[in-house]
Every structure is written in C-alpha cells, then in structure tokens.
Amino acid sequence: MRKTKIVCTLGPSTDNEEVLRQMMLEGMNVARCNFSHGTYEDHKKRMDMVKKLRKEVGRPVAILLDTKGPEVRVKNFKEGKVILEEGQLFTLTADEVEGTKDKVSVTYNRLYEDLEVGMRVLIDDGLIEMKVEKNDIVCRVINGGVVSNHKGVNVPDVDLSMPYISDKDREDILFGIEQDVDFIAASFVQKKEDILQLRKLLEKNGGEDIKIISKIENAQGVANIVEVSDGIMVARGDMGVEIPYEEVPVIQKKIIKKVYRAGKQVITATQMLESMIKNPRPTRAETTDVANAVYDGTSAIMLSGETAAGSYPVEAVKTMVRIAERTEQDVDYRKRFFLFEREANPDITDAICHATCTTALDLNATAIVTVTKSGRSARMVSSYRPKSDIISCATTEKVCRQLSLAWGVTPLVIKEEKDAYALFDKAIMAAEKKGFLKKGDLTVITSGVPIGCSGTTNMIKVQIV
C-alpha cells in the first residue's frame, strides 16, 4: 500500500463527476478547496460532489479548506496594468486612487506603519522588487516588469500588524464548519498566536474537531508554530518569495523532518508537477522533486493548478502515485527508524507506539493495527515511518477521514465495543474483508484499555490472522 498521501486541489477541471471519481480511484486522499478563488456556491457544489463520490467508491477522502489568509494586494489600475521600469519611483498608498505608473492603492491601509526606509517590497510573487525610500511607501524599483490588478504584495522579514483572521477568512471558516470539513489550512501563519486565535474561533462555533494545517510561507513561520498546529503545509511558492530561493530546499527538508517527528502531518506543496497543467507527462526535474519529498518523509504531496485548472487532472494523480510508489520501494525504513531522534521524556502513548514499531520491525509484521478514538496513536506510529503497513480502525468517520492524510495509514471505521479483545477481532476482520490482510499475516495491535478513552494507548498485542 502506498504510504505517501496525495492532496488534490479542486477547480473547474474537476467539476465533471466522472473526472473526480477517477481521481479518487487513482489515489486522491484529500480534496483541497482553495478559498482564494471561487464563490460559496462553487465550493459547496464541489464539497457535495466529494461527499457523494467518496461514499460511492468507498474511500474516506477528506476535505481541506484552504483560507485566503491576511494577504496584502494592490488594488486596481486605470488601464488594468502598468509597466514599471528599473530605477523609477513608485508609491503604494492607503488612499483610494486609480492606479497609474506612479501610484496604486493597497488593500491594507496601515501598511506604511509597518515599513521602514530600506526595507524590500515584492509584488507579484517577487517578480517586481522595490525598496522603501520614504516613510509614505515611496519605493525605488529594483527589478521592473508588468503589474496588473490585485497582485500580491510581500514584505520579507516583517511581521505585519494586520489582524490575522480577516472578515473574509472568518466567514469562510464558519462556512467550512457548516460543511463539515476535515481540515483548515491556515495561510500566512507568522506566529503561534495566529493558530491559537483560529482554534478559539473553531471551538466557539462547533468546529473543535477540525484539524488545523498551518501554511509556512515565510521566515517567521518556520520556528514557532509546529507545537500548536495539527500539521504543516510547506507552501514553497510564497516561501520562495520571502526566503532566498536557494534556501527553500534546505528549509523544506528541515521542516519535513521536524514536523513528522513531532507526530504531525506535513504536506509538500506548490509546482510539483506544474508542467502537467498543459502536458500529459511531467518533466524529469518535476519527477525528481516529487521523489525527493517522498525520500524526505513528507506525509503528503499536493497538486494545485495541475488538477484545479489543468488539462490532465487524472493523469497528474496517476503520475504522482507512480512516482511515490516507486520511490517508497527504495527507502531504507529500518535505517530511518534507528536514526530517529526521540524525545528525551516521551509520554505513555509515544513509548507504546515506539515499542509497537520495534516489535513490528523485529517480527517483520505485515501490518501494525491501531484501534483509536482520536487518531493520535495512529499518527504517533506513523511518525516513526515503519516499513509495515499501518491499518487504523477509528470509531468515527471524521477521525477516519482525517487519518487519510497520515503517512502510511490506511483508515477504516468500525463500531465501538466495550470489550477490548472483541474490538481487536472486529478490527482484524474489517481489514481482512477489505483485502488489507489475509490468513497467516502477522500483525502487531496497539490500543488503549479501557476502550473508548482518548489518550490512553497502553497495550501491544501480537496476533496472527
């Protein structure tokens, strides 16, 4: 079974029911709805289609809502766009003006309070670079080019004082709660307080069971938010704008390692198979990029425009599956396990999960079976990246879907039993019925006793099917 999960962005190219069905059958694990684009009507139709088709195909495909985030953008130009020339002055203003070659309004009217003379300002994913020369954001153009309406503005190494949750994001998140999404991907996270604020909003409005994936997009976000997030998305597009491009691969590897060793999920995203937006095959460089993320141990790899707006969405999923499966065959899981740097003082769940993986490795077990209420034990087992398949039996569909993002985990739903051994037998039978196990397979089971208490993982059982 493939260990690395695949996140696919929905869009016009996936609005055909048969296309989306094929994407699920080929290996899509998570459907991403990008709320930087589209209407609520668009997103609801797509979410409803996912819910309908995942029942039909019998796959626990999760839904991820990706917020727009607290972005700064230029507003409108009189002619729709302008050409900025190297060396000229250009002003970003809080005043409402019709944009010209000399001046344009920005969406955040207090931006000038956060900037100082000498700071860099980047427009349109860094294609246009300017430097502040006066306090009212008069900039000298370093690299010129075309700027059109609503292009993004980035200020590297500056913690902007704008509110983290915008009015739009708040409404989008409340909509997501209504639609029973499984994950919120929080954009432009700079500090852990941003996530605590988001979690408070979820808890206040009945979304406490939604997992938060923090998108790391600048230098401030790398160090301080893993502990309060349920997962991390390495958003290499915006990261490449604010961090020197030669640093992106180094930071990507460090983030992946840090996050999965903390027992959390990590998604590697942006431009993974971008040429497949227009072409049926990837470049060799893209193939290597996907494979390197798999070698690094990423939980998931993500398709954006390739599936949302591309000509070959199903082929893009097939391609990712082929690359991931082939790369996983080459990974030395035993070596990776023994090189794992553990916490000095693990809790009981962590210690039991480590012992489970050790036992599975020693016995060359076909599978590790976790019986879980919250999904934590499955994620902790996953963090050790064992060679054995991880079959996780959850007692709710929500937890089952959320485990679809966890590396190496094949999630199933089973009804809760009060008797532990009856529950273990039910888990084995469910896995056998799905074809994940067969007679004679050796399994290592881990769970908590008493049954049904979240966070009580405390036992290991070796069982032959």
List each language-model region with its residue ranges.
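Non-catalytic helical/linker scaffolds that mediate oligomerization, partner binding
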Residues: 1-465
